[in-house]
């Protein structure tokens, strides 16, 4: 009887809410690499590293409800003389099923929540690469992907507004 009192719009919203789906189908390593350009010399100098972290995400739509999200994380560790001690790169990927979301919600999910799910796997893989390469463990801090997404959206909006203003 409650359904009889709802407007058609409310019924549509309730139906949409019942159809929203999110699932992790698979998490996998798409690519990884480790280089020690200095070779054994990296172990003969005092260990005072400068760590640089480069982060990027890529979203590939596979079909209507399936997306591949790839978190690309590159760590470059340099010594005091700016020589690279090691370079480690991981492309941690996930296959996600998503249905029933509007475009803004979908974009936020794929650009924020999915990379946040993938990050612990990438962090562990990078740590493992470093220690297997003979270096001390990497202790990468957590990343706030939601804040990064919001920042990127604000920046895109500002650029769009500037592009529309006459010079």
From Swiss-Prot:
Signal peptide: none
Entry's localization field: Cytoplasm
SUPFAM superfamilies: SecB-like
GO BP terms: protein folding; protein tetramerization; protein transport
CC terms in the record's Gene Ontology section: cytoplasm
Assigned keywords, A-Z: Chaperone, Cytoplasm, Protein transport, Translocation, Transport
One term of GO molecular function: unfolded protein binding
Record flagged with keyword Ion transport: no
Pfam families, sorted: SecB
Quaternary organization: Homotetramer, a dimer of dimers. One homotetramer interacts with 1 SecA dimer.
General function of this protein: One of the proteins required for the normal export of preproteins out of the cell cytoplasm. It is a molecular chaperone that binds to a subset of precursor proteins, maintaining them in a translocation-competent state. It also specifically binds to its receptor SecA.
Family under the similarity heading: Belongs to the SecB family.
UniProt protein name: Protein-export protein SecB
Organism, scientific name: Teredinibacter turnerae (strain ATCC 39867 / T7901)
Lineage: Bacteria, Pseudomonadati, Pseudomonadota, Gammaproteobacteria, Cellvibrionales
């Amino acid at each position: 009887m409650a359904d009889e009192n709802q407007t058609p719009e409310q019924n549509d919203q309730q139906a949409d809410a019942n159809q929203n789906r999110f699932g992790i189908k698979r998490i996998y390593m798409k690519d990884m690499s480790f280089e020690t350009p200095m070779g054994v010399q990296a172990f003969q100098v005092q260990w005072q590293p400068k760590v640089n972290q480069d982060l990027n995400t890529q979203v590939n739509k596979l079909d209507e409800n399936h997306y591949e999200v790839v978190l690309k994380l590159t760590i470059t560790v340099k010594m005091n003389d700016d020589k690279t001690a090691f370079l480690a790169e991981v492309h941690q990927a996930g296959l996600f099923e998503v249905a029933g979301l509007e475009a803004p919600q979908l974009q936020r999910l794929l650009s924020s929540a999915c990379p946040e799910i993938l990050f612990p796997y990438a962090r562990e893989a990078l740590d493992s690469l470093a220690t297997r390469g003979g270096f001390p463990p990497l202790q990468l801090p957590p990343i706030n992907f939601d804040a990064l997404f919001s920042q990127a959206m604000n920046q895109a909006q500002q650029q769009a507004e500037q592009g529309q203003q006459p010079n």
